[in-house]
């Protein structure tokens, strides 16, 4: 099973059915892993499976629950709840809690291993047959009716007698093996479009940074204080909690480019209470561990001189933005 081959929480086949030789022993998975490792700007990922009508997130095992903090869960929830609206009949679920324990899964490697917000979409759901939930009623003929009235019996092979060399007289027939696992043709385009729309919505909420405000204050004696506020206009932070905790990616850097002398670089934690932290080394470029989704970070510099300047933020996942 390619989805039991990823290098997080991997277990051998006698524990996790479907596991192969070792993590990333399948060349296709290894190629994806190597691509992701070479592209630290990747902030979001989705993979498509079948079937079940689900939008899944990790963790696959209960032991990894603590890899997700409340802020990350809030991001996952907000995006996936919109997915439930965009794709009727799909349910947002957590693998270990709502399905079963799964080890070596793609979801876990992307998020826990790389700090990337990731979903798996389980394509196709019986809800799409008649736009209503299924039941466990043994007399519910929804599947039969769907084949009869909408597929014109294309999914069902009539039973017929067959002379089996070992078992003698038997009957063969019934529903085709792909029925219930993949979309009938006329429903494929619609569901593919809706899943694509959800993927684009997910992508839209990857970090987008801008310098929202720059202001100056004269301190006298040729000194001035320059304060810059960097805003993230999307739901995802520049670093997930797993990323920050394990220092997976480098910090975001906010730099003042000027010929004036930069005497101090300071991160503002609470402007109202005047709580700040000075960066002792290289004050011109302030390293911040994370810029929160739909939030801001404020920094300031003490500068000697009156030269022009440009403020730039450089983030692996949030891109580059500047203001003069």
Question: Where are the regions a protein language model picked out?
Answer:
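Metallocarboxypeptidase
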Residues: 1-217, 224-225, 229-234, 257-283
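A structural signal for short secondary-structure junctions
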Residues: 40, 111-115, 218-222, 246-248, ...
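Residue-level recognition of well-ordered beta-strand positions that form the cores
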Residues: 122, 229-231, 255, 300-302, ...
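Short, contiguous acidic/charged loop-to-helix segments that flank catalytic cores in large enzymes
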Residues: 186, 242-244, 288-291
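Non-catalytic terminal regions with compositionally biased, polar/charged low complexity
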Residues: 223, 235-237, 320-322
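Short amphipathic, basic-aromatic surface patches that mediate peripheral association
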Residues: 230-245
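Extended low-complexity, serine/threonine- and proline-enriched intrinsically disordered segments
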Residues: 243-261
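Low-complexity, intrinsically disordered segments enriched in Ser/Thr together with acidic residues
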Residues: 284-324
